[in-house]
Amino acid sequence: MNEVIVMAMQQRDKLIEEIRRIKGWGMSLTLSFAKSAKFFGGYVMDVEAVGKDILDCAYAIHSRFGSGLLEKAYRVILATELKRLGHLVEEEKVCGFSYNGQEYQNMFRVDLLVDDSIVVELKSVSRREPVFAKQCLTYLRLLDKHLGFVINFGMPSLKDGIERIANNI
């Protein structure tokens, strides 16, 4: 078993060096191992880089389609674009939590969970509501995640519809 772990770590290190060499990123590239990941050889870039990909895709989608589609359409398109970039994307992930030793299953759905690290809540309504950010922060806390976004595609200007939510665990 230990030999398998050592081999996996050696392969990880080789992959990191190869990516740095190809991209010219040097030591500034931050990679972390993600056990459950089935993408990019088991590696995922740091959450800020993933967050940038999410926002870049959201802006491209909003530029192309505007604010007239249903939330489901934006979710499917955004998930498809992020997968195309090599991210692990779980759509409408059913989640639960524990409280006082009791497990509560199937209590809420996260619109998108990207690379098992970023919660994305999507909306397609004409105004921003404070409850959207509260909902996202609650999901971050229950899932023990650090970063989330509320993206409201219903706003005429997408920059007015994006909220970055940080959970200071």
Can you say where each PLM-predicted feature lies in the sequence?
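Short, low-complexity, charge-dense intrinsically disordered segments
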Residues: 1-43
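Solvent-exposed, charged helical/coil patches
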Residues: 26-88, 137, 164-169
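Accessory recognition modules or surfaces
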Residues: 46-55, 59, 99-114
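Conserved catalytic cores of phosphodiester-cleaving nucleases, focusing on short active-site segments
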Residues: 66, 89, 110-128, 139
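Gly/Ser/Thr-rich beta-alpha loop segments that engage phosphate groups in nucleotides
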Residues: 68-70, 103, 156
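Short connector loops at helix/strand junctions that flank enzyme active sites
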Residues: 77, 84, 92, 105-109, ...
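A short acidic/basic microdomain associated with nuclease active sites
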Residues: 83-100
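Nucleic-acid nuclease catalytic cores
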Residues: 123-169
